[in-house]
């Protein structure tokens, strides 16, 4: 079978093509099929870039949605959501890509090249991992980079965008390639395609790119984390960067409204609320300790002590249950009502409450467990029902 001509390589802005079906086969898993064409505008998945989406239209008017594209031995196979009988070898077909999908991937890919090139220039960082996700671009570098370094690189990358320099594609000979300094993640057989962004990057790449850096719009690093000796970056470009900025602005506005703070004072307001929360947390801890002591003093040595206190979190439940075991050798339980039933902590000094906890979970639709002396969890019954069950089981 002849190889598929890639119309997107000389012109990434081409959106339509007239082609001929080379082969068609059903896909039993999806209920659709796969179609090989003699030429296509659809970019196949590869090099960290997702495949194009779009449609194939047959002469009889049947329109097939292209959901994925893969290349095998030079042939591009288009996954479609249906395979009518008219889709046979030799049939003419009209292809049309989803341009918004394509241009988004072009913005992300060119933006990644710019940022990767800048990181390489500034820090000697190699791009050791790259993927265009549905929400952000993931980039992995070979060396650690500080927050200040990333901020400087982000600014330098956007300066390349503002310069609106051309994105150049070339196919050097082996002799020319040997003298060329360029980025590449792997050894490439056959003709090497070089994408050059003057002042930023020279890289071997098979993907689709914008014509100029200005079409990238903006490059924004959303997040970074240490990863395998380097950093993993979450990056957005173009329209994604705009949408991310709008979302950040909306979140900031909501936080500002809640805290009665202006946009440039939200961080100060959050710190103030956090300090207040921390102080209240310590106060709450002390008040609970006094309450737990008082409840423990009501317990008679050797008798069961089951106490219900509204509003306790798991830590509070555990603290109360342990405090009760210091006052009695009987069965101890701390309970608190929840939206779905009851949170509990069952404990006993020198005892094993695991079997009792298992029985409670079975009887009252609960879940939880722990160590012999203390088990914690929740169930669907009210605190009164839990207390009644525990007392009945421990008679």
Task: List where the protein language model places each region.
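A glycine- and charged-residue-rich anion-binding loop/surface
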Residues: 1-395
């Amino acid at each position: 079978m002849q190889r598929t001509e890639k119309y997107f390589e000389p012109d990434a802005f081409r959106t339509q093509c007239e082609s001929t079906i080379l082969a068609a086969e059903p896909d039993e898993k999806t209920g659709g099929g796969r179609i090989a064409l003699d030429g296509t505008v659809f970019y196949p998945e590869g090099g960290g870039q997702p495949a194009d989406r779009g449609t194939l239209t047959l002469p009889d008017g049947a329109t097939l949605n292209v959901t994925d594209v893969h290349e095998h031995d030079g042939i591009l196979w288009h996954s479609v959501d249906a395979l009518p009988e008219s889709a046979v070898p030799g049939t003419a077909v009209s292809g049309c890509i989803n341009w918004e999908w394509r241009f988004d991937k072009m913005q992300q890919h060119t933006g990644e090249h710019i940022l990767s090139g800048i990181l390489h220039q500034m820090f000697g960082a190699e791009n050791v991992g790259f993927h265009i996700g549905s929400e952000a671009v993931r980039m992995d570098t070979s060396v650690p980079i500080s927050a200040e370094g990333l901020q400087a690189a982000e600014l330098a990358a956007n300066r390349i965008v503002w310069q609106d320099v051309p994105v150049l594609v070339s196919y050097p000979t082996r002799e020319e390639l040997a003298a060329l300094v360029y980025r590449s993640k792997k050894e490439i057989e056959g003709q090497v395609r070089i994408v050059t962004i003057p002042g930023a990057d020279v890289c071997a790449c098979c993907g689709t790119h914008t014509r100029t850096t200005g079409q990238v719009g903006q490059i924004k690093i959303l997040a970074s984390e240490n990863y395998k000796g380097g950093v993993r970056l979450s990056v957005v470009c173009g329209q994604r960067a705009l949408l991310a900025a709008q979302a950040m602005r909306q979140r900031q506005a909501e936080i500002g409204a809640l805290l009665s703070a202006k946009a440039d004072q939200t961080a100060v307001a959050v710190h103030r609320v956090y300090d207040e929360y921390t102080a209240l947390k310590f106060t709450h801890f002390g008040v609970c300790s006094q309450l737990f002591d008082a409840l423990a003093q009501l317990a008679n040595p050797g008798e069961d002590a089951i106490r219900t206190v509204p509003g306790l979190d798991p830590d509070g439940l555990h603290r109360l249950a342990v405090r009760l075991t210091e006052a009695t050798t009987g069965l101890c339980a701390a309970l608190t009502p929840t939206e779905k039933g009851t949170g509990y902590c069952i404990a006993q000094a020198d005892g094993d409450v695991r079997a009792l906890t298992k029985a409670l979970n079975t009887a009252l639709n609960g879940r939880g467990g722990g160590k012999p002396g203390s088990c914690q969890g929740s169930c669907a019954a009210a605190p009164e029902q839990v207390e009644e069950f525990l007392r009945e089981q421990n008679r």
